[in-house]
Amino acid sequence: MGKWVTIIFVLFLYAIAQQENPAEEVKKQKELLLKEMGILPGDVYAEQGRDMFNKPMGNAGKSCSSCHGQDGRYLRGAYAHMPRYYKDMDAVADLDTRIKYCMEKYMGVGNVKHDLNFKSIATYVATLSNGMKMDVKLTHPKEREMYEKGRELWYARVGKMDFSCAICHDSEAGKRVFLQTVVAVKEDKVATHWPAYRFSNDQLWTMEDRIRGCFGDMRVAPPEHFHWAVVALNLYLSYKAKGGVVRVPGFIY
């Protein structure tokens, strides 16, 4: 009996997936929010991030703007070239990892958490590259090394499901998995619209959150935020998005 209940439930979910159009649902929810609020949630978070960017924090009494100018005027276009190698870190960093490093080393902030305030700052910094083309390069040896690690992780089959990133986003791209359409990483330039607001769970996510979420979807324990594996996959995805126009925060199912 239990077996048949499971089969019927799966078929029911499949039927719903065929009836719903995720793209239309995104459009509908976006229009509804703009009509009711006049602004999208992601843009609200970005504005909050701008305020925090200019606010002193940590033992050094500095703000992000102390180094990068009021409202980050010296960071315009920076996100379009990330992840990248940073000499002061002697490492490749994505947006999240770089912000964490700067907070700890230059601002004296202890115990940096990947919380909503952190993600709001990251989102604001990313908006400073809006309208610019993604142009991640692999000129430094450590950038090339990290990219290769990301590529290896992309194709690695892991977990009880024996799944890989490539199975979904290369082989099965464009197909429906319940209420979502699997995106094609290169063609859809996915890195250009993260950070993003996800209306399905009412949360602001950075690219690190999205990558970690995919580990969970594959029934594999995700690496911690700022882990090299997350940065490596981020670099792989961002390099594949080269030439795409940055438009953040995205509005995602």
From Swiss-Prot:
Keyword DNA-binding listed? The answer is no
Q: Which domain of life is it from?
A: Bacteria
Which cell locations does it reside in? Periplasm
What GO cellular component entries does it have? cytochrome complex; periplasmic space
Q: Where does the Cytochrome c domain lie?
A: 44-129
Q: Where does heme c 1 bind?
A: 64, 67-68, 102
Annotated binding of substrate, by residue: 210
Q: Which cofactor does it need?
A: heme c
Q: Where is the active site?
A: 214
GO MF annotation, one: transferase activity
Provide the alphabetized UniProt keywords: Electron transport, Heme, Iron, Metal-binding, Periplasm, Signal, Transferase, Transport
What PTM annotation applies here?
Answer: Cysteine persulfide at Cys-214.
Q: What does the record list as coiled-coil region(s)? A: none
User: EC number(s) of the enzyme?
Assistant: 2.8.5.2
Q: Where is the signal peptide?
A: 1-17
Residues annotated as binding heme c 2 are: 165, 168-169, 214
Q: Which InterPro entries match?
A: Cyt_c-like_dom, Cyt_c-like_dom_sf, SoxA
Under SUPFAM superfamilies, the record lists: Cytochrome c (SSF46626)
Reaction(s) catalysed by this chain, per the record, are: L-cysteinyl-[SoxY protein] + thiosulfate + 2 Fe(III)-[cytochrome c] = S-sulfosulfanyl-L-cysteinyl-[SoxY protein] + 2 Fe(II)-[cytochrome c] + 2 H(+); S-sulfanyl-L-cysteinyl-[SoxY protein] + thiosulfate + 2 Fe(III)-[cytochrome c] = S-(2-sulfodisulfanyl)-L-cysteinyl-[SoxY protein] + 2 Fe(II)-[cytochrome c] + 2 H(+)
Q: What Gene3D superfamilies does the annotation carry?
A: Cytochrome c-like domain
Question: Which one Pfam family would you cite for this protein?
Answer: SoxA-TsdA_cyt-c
How is this protein organized at the quaternary level? Heterodimer of SoxA and SoxX.
| Family stated for the protein in its record | Belongs to the SoxA family.
Its biological function? C-type diheme cytochrome, which is part of the SoxAX cytochrome complex involved in sulfur oxidation. The SoxAX complex catalyzes the formation of a heterodisulfide bond between the conserved cysteine residue on a sulfur carrier SoxYZ complex subunit SoxY and thiosulfate or other inorganic sulfur substrates. This leads to the liberation of two electrons, which may be transferred from the SoxAX complex to another cytochrome c that then channels them into the respiratory electron transport chain. Some electrons may be used for reductive CO(2) fixation.
Q: Which NCBIfam families match?
A: thiosulf_SoxA (TIGR04484)
> What is the name listed in the Swiss-Prot or TrEMBL entry for this protein?
L-cysteine S-thiosulfotransferase subunit SoxA
Q: Which organism is it from?
A: Hydrogenobacter thermophilus (strain DSM 6534 / IAM 12695 / TK-6)
- Gene assigned in the entry: soxA1
